[in-house]
Amino acid sequence: SSFCRKKLKCVIVFLCPFLWLFGLHGSAMVNGLVSPVLQANSLANAEILASGQELTVANGGHIVTQQFLDQFMTVTGAGLTLGAVFFMTVFAKSKKYRELGNLALLPAFFNINESIIFSTPIVMNPMMAVPFIFAPVVSGLITYSALYFGFVPLFTAVQVPWTTPPILSGFLVGGVPAAILQGIVLSISFFIYFPFLKKIDSANCKKERQRSEERRVGKECRSRWSP
């Protein structure tokens, strides 16, 4: 039913990043709950297409499928953290976040982001919880709308491994429109993370300067009192 589909979408959009905030592997836990339904939806879409009908919502096509989760809700990792990684790599001023961004950049392109989740940290961090949950919500709304109104074709049984890099994975499951949509939601994720990361990066810069000053004073004291 329509009500059940809406509940399923809410579970996917909210529960996955929410569990990660407490250090639980939200992606694995949510996948275990919803993957049978999502894959059944993908197969149902394939059957509609195989029957010679146009694959549309009006003809009974499903929007929320395994590809919806893997290629749009958790692309580059739970929370769509490529936007955060890009900020750290390009715009961060603190040594900690520049190094973390450089370390996390390559894994992010294979949808692996534990280094960002645990080292930023996002886990148990109320400030970072906001963009971490909000980015998938925005992605979900945009993707759902694009599929509903036919800007992107509904997904069929074509699936790719979850480690397939973004843009390529979108192209493989939904052609050029899906690849473009991935680029759009990932670009938006950068702007969602930007103000929050800018604030914690500035705070970390101050801490680094304080530690540097403390070390400098300590060295001066030791040299002054050394025989």
What kind of feature is each model-predicted range?
Residues 16-17, 105-107:
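Contiguous, well-ordered alpha-helical segments that form the cores/surfaces of helical PPI scaffolds
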Residues 46-65, 83-85, 103, 116-216:
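Transmembrane alpha-helical segments and their short flanking loops
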Residues 7-10, 97, 130:
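Short, surface-exposed helix-loop/turn micro-motifs enriched in polar/charged residues
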Residues 82, 94-104:
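Membrane-proximal intracellular helices of multi-pass ion channels
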Residues 213-214, 218-227:
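Positively charged, low-complexity/disordered segments
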